[in-house]
Structure formats: C-alpha cells, structure tokens
C-alpha cells in the first residue's frame, strides 16, 4: 500500500507537470566571468501555470536573489512565460515587441497641463494654487464643489491673438459649463451680486432635494446620479415617483427656463443672473468683472457663434498634429538575459545562488539556482535519463514509486570529479515544467554515504508534450542539446580551439554527437548502457568495457586534480619543464657531421645456415671490427688440430 500511495501522489504530480494549466518551473542559470572581467549569463527561462495566475492582471514578476529583492522585475506573457523588458530607440521585430511593465517609472509621459481647465465633477480636494486667480469667477459651496457664476467668455482682440499664437486647445462642453481651454481667450466674469448668492442658495436646496431618500437613485460608473427607471411599467409606485419628481421641479422650471437658452448652433448658455442675461442680449457679451480688467471690443452673438462653431470643427484634429514638438517614444522589447552591469549589481557569490520568482504578492513562486563560475573552470556534462538512471523509461516509472533505479557508483564518481576541481552540469531534454521534480530527484540520490554534487540542471524551455514529442517520437534530443551547448560556449567566450567542456557522460550516440559538436575530445566522451557498462566512444570497436565503480579507481587518471592556485600559471613553470636540463646548443659544423653519420646505410642482419646473424652493407673498414682477433684465431686452430689427431689415431686402431 505504501508503494501504491507513492505512485498515486507521483502520478498526480506528473499530470500537473504535463497539464499546461498547472505547469510551472524555472531553469537554472549559469553566470560566467569572462577573461575581460565582464559577466555573461544563460537565459532566464521561467514559466507559470494558468491555475497559478487566476487574475489576468498578474503580469508583474518579482525577481529575488538569495532572499533579496532586485529592481529587475519580469513580465508575464500570454502563455505564462516570463521575460525582462527593456526600452530601446531602435526598431524592434514584431515577435519581440511588448508593453512596458506597469510601474511609476515606466508610465507614459503626461502632456503639459493647460492654464485653464475644467474642474472635475467629483473633485473634493481644495482648489490648487494655479486657479487662485480665477477664484473671483467661482463660488465655493459648502460641500466643496465649485459653482461657476457665468458662462460668457470675453474674447481678446485679433492683435493679441497674433502676438501669442495658441499651442493647443480643447473644446470642452458640460451640462453646466462651457470652457475653451488652451485657446487665446481669457474668461472675464461680472462681480458677485446678492441675486447671484440667492440663485446659488436655490441651486443648493435643489441639489439637496434631488438627493433625498424618497427618490430611488443610483450612481453610475462615471459618477452621474441617475433615477431608477427599471421596470418600464406604469405601476402605482412609478406613478407616485413621477408625481413626486414633477412636484419637486414645478417651482424651479420657470427659473431654469429663463436661465437657459439654446442658440442656433446647439450651445447652452448659462447666465449668473437676469441682469447678465439682459446685458448679453443688448451688447452681445457679459459686463466687465472689474475696472482693472481691459474690456474687449463688443461683438455680436452671431460673430461669437461663428467663432465657436469654427473651434468645434477644428476640434476633430489630433492633439499630436497640434503639438509644437513631436516626441519620439521608446520601443519596448523582450529579453531573457541581463547585462554585465545588471548582473554585477546582484552581488552574486561564487558557486550556488538561490533564485525565486514571485507573482501576486508571493502567492505563486518558482525557484531555481544560479551558479557563478569563472571562464577557466572545466565543466563535465552529464545526461540524466539513462546515464544516472539505469534506463530512460523505467527511470521515470521507478522514481514515481520511490524505488532507486540509479547506476551503482555514479554518486561517488561525480563527487570525486568535483573534488578534483571540475564543475558538473546536468543536461536533459525534459521540459521546464519538470524542473522542480528533476532537482528533487537528483538531490535525494544517496549511495553509500555519497550524494550527487550540486550543479545547474539545464532543461528544455518547451512544454512537456513538445519535449516528449521531440525525444520519444522524433528521436532527436540532440537538436536541443546542441543548441544549448553552443549557447553556453558563447558565454564562456573562449578562443575557437578551446572549449569549456572537459568531458561528457551519456547513454546514446546522440549524446556523443552533441558533445563532439562542442569540441569535447572523443577520448573523454563516456557512454553507458543499461547494464552499467561504460565505454569510451573512441575505443568502442576495440571492445573496451568499464563501469562507474572501476572508474572510481582511475578517477585521477581520467580527471587529474586541478590546483586552483596554479590553474592560471604558465605551463613552463611546471615540475617537468622547470627542473629538466636545458637542450644542448649545436653549431652548424656539428650538425653537418651528425647528418653525415646518420646518412650511412644501416647494417641489416642476415641469417646464416647456422642460425647466426650477419650484417649486410658493412664497409671494409667496419669489417675489421667484426673479424676475430689473432689470439682467438690461434686458439681455435689448436683446438681443431687436436681433435683431428685423435680422430686419426682412432681410425688406425679400428683398421688394425
């Protein structure tokens, strides 16, 4: 039952990883300090599931390093992928275009404020200092609203308009006011009279009566108060409400009818008093506000209406065409990398750093690791499925039920490799949605007290189904691995003959092809099969076989220790090169003599009928060296003569 429970939980987690709606994860990042002390990084691949982001407004991703928030926020795309946003003046391709992240620093620039503006309907703040000069033209009510006293506008002369051309205008119409902002006109209002105050008091009482509880009302989205007109039936309640509204407006209708007048152009004119209305009908404009103001030349109503209609026609023009200076707005583009200065501001520590990406105030978080290396750190690549596990498919299945299905000795071998000064990197074709489960699996491997060393886990940024389709159906996992390794070579920025990858472990020929693509020597490409037999790719035809356990005994031979202190030293100061005796200096004559001595024909041996070897090509001078000495020659003759005499005596005796 324990295995069944583990299998059910693991299948649920696996389904969540496969389901695009719940897929979330982040790939580890590698930051390299290059030879010129600049920093370069691999892409920041982060993806959030749709169920983790219930609100479409959750677009801002907070990015933190080692628990400290950074100022480089990310933005979420439609598919849940996160990316950085930067502004540029250059042209941006359509697939890389985006909008800026919502923040005070990236908000669009506001247009310059105009001197004369229309007060907002629900503005409850105090009047700003910019409008203090217009206080004589308005009356501040008890509830904080500004009520204009008159709506007649006195125009300046054409000479003044020619001297100060307008920079823009906005023709605003309201139910209770008409203001022309940004134009070459300045409002001039009459002095406040007792009749005006009585009129304002009546308006206040009317507002209070309209806002009573006996009238069913509601406030719209734009702040307007509307009567409840639901039902569209002539019921008794509706009749009573209509009668109440009629009684409410009965006393005010004559006054409103006198104050409002509709002209030929459809404009509404609102006068402060009857005196102002009569003055406008006689002279064509309102009386002057004070003696200090210079009155404009009187104009007829027809001239004023013609000018207003002309402004209405010009209102259709865009504000951009009327602006004196055209501003160039920056373009915003997507990116997955940070610059060298931005990486340096993260205050990274050598080795492992923790990353976290949070959305919606930390309710949805993805974690990853960042490894800070140097350009001269040798890197060992290791596959996961089939290389650390015993097989591709069974490695996934037995991991789901909690059974160990790893090769024996792999933890100790990788630990010894890292102890000798090498960096380990885990490369797999799994999708980014399996990042957390893959890191959890590697972290929990333990064999005889040894665990796998820490290293970046590089996965495919594709979705789970796309990654499985490429690896299982198309059988081309090397497409992703080759592209990934090429990108990592670029961030190390080493010369072409050199490569940052020292060795590679895999289980297929596709892994060997990927490692060979980034110039890993064939003598250091190790392939392991499901039986645990390791062979070198170059010696595969020779039948050479080994295992992780036997490689532990020769780990210093395959991966010699690298001293950190002497890693950057020149090779001429090693023990072999520094302590050996220097080469002899030969003159030209000595070199000619040595060439003559070596030009003689070699002395090749020749077998005789007695089995001895004689040398051909021997000169007469050299033949004396191989002839026996006189002493040896006389000794041999005496020995042979004695033997002949004994043989003769024996023959004679036999004959007798």
Swiss-Prot record:
GO MF terms held by the record: magnesium ion binding; phosphatidate phosphatase activity
- The family this protein is said to belong to: Belongs to the lipin family.
Tagged with keyword Phosphoprotein: yes
Instruction: Tell me which Gene Ontology terms the entry assigns under biological process.
Output: endoplasmic reticulum organization; fatty acid catabolic process; lipid storage; nuclear membrane organization; triglyceride biosynthetic process
* Pfam families for this protein: Lipin_N, LNS2, Ned1_M
| Acidic residues bias locations | 640-656
Phosphoserine is found on 99, 103, 107, 159, 286, 318, 321, 587
Bias class Polar residues marks the residues at: 99-118, 318-328
Q: What is this protein called?
A: Nuclear elongation and deformation protein 1
Which Gene3D superfamilies did the record assign? Answer: HAD superfamily/HAD-like
What UniProt keywords apply to this chain's record, in alphabetical order? Phosphoprotein
Q: Which GO terms describe its cellular component?
A: cytosol; nucleus
Disulfide-bonded cysteine pairs: these are none
The beginning of the lineage is: Eukaryota, Fungi, Dikarya, Ascomycota, Taphrinomycotina
- Could you tell me the superkingdom of the organism this chain comes from? Eukaryota
Spell out the residue ranges making up region: Disordered.
99-121, 282-328, 587-656
Q: How does it assemble?
A: Interacts with dis3, pim1 and nup189.
Positions with biased composition (Low complexity): 291-300, 596-609
Instruction: Mark the residues carrying the PTM Phosphothreonine.
Output: 106
